[in-house]
């Protein structure tokens, strides 16, 4: 990943170590294993993808994680991003709306020894309130607006990274940071993610 990640500006050594350690080929199908370490997304079935390594690194770095952090992930997919997080933090909670993907990711993560990841099937728009508040929230699929339930579940000083924009349209990666009662919002870069699915995904956000 040297050219893909380090030479493109990723500096967080915890993220870099995790990216080197996690076997990305274990998170893709047999037919895509030769491309597992290429810097582009790959299909994982059910209309979903595993994100390109550089974007995984960018999003992980922006969260400013430490080993005591508790993280909520929306969009488990293959489980790759959760594994990266699990190498860095104490506990990861991950929500996946596609039951087959959730089950496969849970089995895969357990097999690889990531016992600090909990996976559940559910509507990611609603988050996982039972374990809130979170130090960090990462969303790996794009809602059109910031989901208010996720903002509510972000702890004091917490950071959220998520793509925003319409399916098939112009999207951007955003960083949200809770500062007291305010949410500071910063645009990071243009991106292209699969759309957040779920019955409440189109609900307007008060932060847009």
What are these regions (language model features)?
Residues 64-184:
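Conserved nucleotide-cofactor-binding alpha/beta core module
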Residues 1-72, 80-84, 88, 101-118, ...:
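Class I SAM-dependent transferase core
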């Amino acid at each position: 990943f040297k050219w893909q990640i380090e030479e493109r500006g990723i500096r967080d050594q915890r993220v870099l170590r995790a990216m080197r350690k996690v076997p990305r080929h274990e998170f893709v199908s047999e037919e895509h294993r030769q491309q597992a370490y290429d810097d582009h997304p790959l299909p994982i079935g059910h209309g979903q993808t595993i994100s390109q390594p550089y974007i995984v690194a960018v999003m992980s770095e922006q969260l400013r994680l430490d080993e005591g952090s508790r993280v909520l992930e929306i969009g488990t997919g293959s489980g790759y991003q959760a594994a990266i997080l699990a190498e860095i933090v104490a506990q990861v909670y991950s929500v996946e709306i596609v039951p087959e993907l959730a089950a496969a990711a849970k089995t895969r993560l357990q097999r690889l020894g990531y016992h600090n990841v909990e996976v559940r099937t559910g509507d990611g728009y609603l988050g996982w309130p039972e374990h809130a508040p979170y130090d960090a929230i990462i969303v790996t699929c794009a809602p059109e607006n910031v989901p208010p339930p996720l903002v509510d579940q972000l702890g004091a000083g917490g950071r959220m990274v998520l793509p925003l924009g319409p399916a098939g349209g112009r999207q951007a990666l955003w960083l949200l940071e809770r500062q007291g009662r305010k949410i500071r919002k910063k645009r990071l870069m243009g991106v292209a993610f699969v759309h957040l699915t779920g019955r409440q995904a189109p609900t307007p956000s008060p932060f847009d």
